[in-house]
Structure formats: structure tokens, C-alpha cells
Amino acid sequence: MRRTLWVPVVVSTLGTLVFQGQSAHAATTPAAALATRPATTPPAITPPAAARLTKPKPKSTVKPTTVVALTFDDGDRSHAMAARLLERYGLRGTFYVNSGDLGKKGKLTRAQLAAIAKAGHEIGGHTVNHERLTDLGPDEQAATICSDRRALLGMGYRVRTFAYPYGAVDASARQAARDCGYNAARTIGGIATKPCGGCVVAEPARPERVYEIRTPGSVHDDTSLAEMKRYVIRAEQNGGGLLPLAFHMVCAKGCGSYSVRTKVLDQFLGWLATRERRGTAVRTIADVTGGKVRPVPAESVTP
């Protein structure tokens, strides 16, 4: 009789321990890994909120008054990690890459760029090798802008918007961006970074100069979390509109003037994700400007 009673108790105790162990494991297992488990072994508890937000947030039926566009220039290798940070909060960004630099030291590989696009981020053009367009003649401008877009389209990306390297733009560069099939182009600067009377604090919801969309300069290593928050709050308090932010490298300890610390970016994204209830949403530049994927002109052949 003792053996008969002892066995169920041991089995019950072991079952409890196994269940507790599975629960602890489920609490630390990434959402992607949980998704691959058989349906017969669901996780015992819900993963943390940050792990759950791996898909873009569904667009609200209420039109936001303020739209923040998070843009990342130059195809730096740190952008693979930056994209994952955005995904943690259900946000998506625009990544402007130089097609001729992919795979080079310090730059994204083609596989990394494909993963960024697959996660729902926008891929945009940035010239073949980051040429300063105002140093080129109109034909050279058109050649690098069109060749870059042609290459990215050939990789399978829906390339609809462009960013001028260094923010350097003139009339012929704007025309080249249009002629090469882009629906919009972003520059650097033009939006106030400090409070001032009558200053521009955001683009209109539909930018008036769609081939010269402005930003509050570039985010630098000395741009504080509080300052980035103020950019957004000033836009909210002044009627809203489109606020594009331009980032470059993302580094844990800083890696030059044109960089943002990983911790600061993470904190900013976490804060930004809470602004939806205030009428502020995060969208890609292509989401805002719209338009179909237009063809790029055929490459000219020199006789």
C-alpha cells in the first residue's frame, strides 16, 4: 500500500517541478523561438511586452496629427541592430543605403539589408557611393542617383524615396531625384532645433517641397534624449505635421560626431512608442508621401 501511495506523490511533485521549469524557460525565450514550438506545447506564461512587439503596430483608424519618421543614413553596419531596436517597440524606419558600398567594411551586407526589409522597414536610395551631389554636374548627379536606384530595385526593394548625402542639394539634384523615379527626397536641416519665434518645427503633414523634405539637422553624439523629445513635443504643441529625424551610426559608447548611443536611442524609441495616445505616430517616409514604385529610366549606352 505504501508503494502505491508514494508513486503518485513523486509523480505529482516531479510534474510540478517540470511545469515550473518550463514556465521559467518560457519567460526568457524570445517570441520568435516560441512561435516555432509545436501547438501541443504552448508557453506557460506570456513573454515580456518588449518581446511581443515584433510586428508593426496596426495603423490606427484615427489620423495622427504628428508623424515622426525615423531615418537612418549610409547603410552603416550598426543599422541591423537599430532595426531590431525599432522592432522591439513595434516601430518601423527608413534606411537610406548606398548600393555600391554594401558589403564593405563597416557597412551592411546584402543579407543584413534583406533582413531589414523583410521586417517591414523602408529601403531608400542614397547614391551609389555617397557622393556629394553639389560637387557634381547635372549628368553625373543623374547617373549616380539613377544607378543607385536601379541597383536597389534589382535587389527586389520597393525604392520610392531618396536622401541627399550630406543633405547637399541644388535644383539639378532635385530634378534628378524626380527623373530617376523617386516620389520624394529628404535633405538635412531646415527645422529648428531650439525654441524661436516663427521657426519651422515640422514639415506640413503633406510636405510642400516633396523633393526637399527637411529635418532638425542630424542627430549627433551630443544630442541628448531630452532634446530629441523636445523636437517631438514642439511639433505636437504647434499643430503637428511631419517630423523626420536623421540618424547615422548607432554605437554603445559613441563612435564619432554623427552617432547616437544605443541606450539613448532605445530610451527615445520606448518613449516615442507611448505618444500614440497623444496623436503622434511613427511612419516611414514612403508611408507619408505615398505613390507607386515608378520605373527608373533605362541606362544610357555610350556609342
Question: For the regions a protein language model found, what residue spans apply to each?
Answer:
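Metal-dependent polysaccharide deacetylase catalytic core of the NodB/CE4 family, i.e.
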Residues: T65-V68, E87-G217, G241, A246-A252, ...
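Aromatic/hydrophobic pocket-lining residues that form the small-molecule binding cavity
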Residues: H79, T109, Q141, I145, ...
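Non-membrane alpha-helical structural segments and their capping/turn regions in soluble enzymes
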Residues: P138-A143, D222-L225, S259-T262, D266
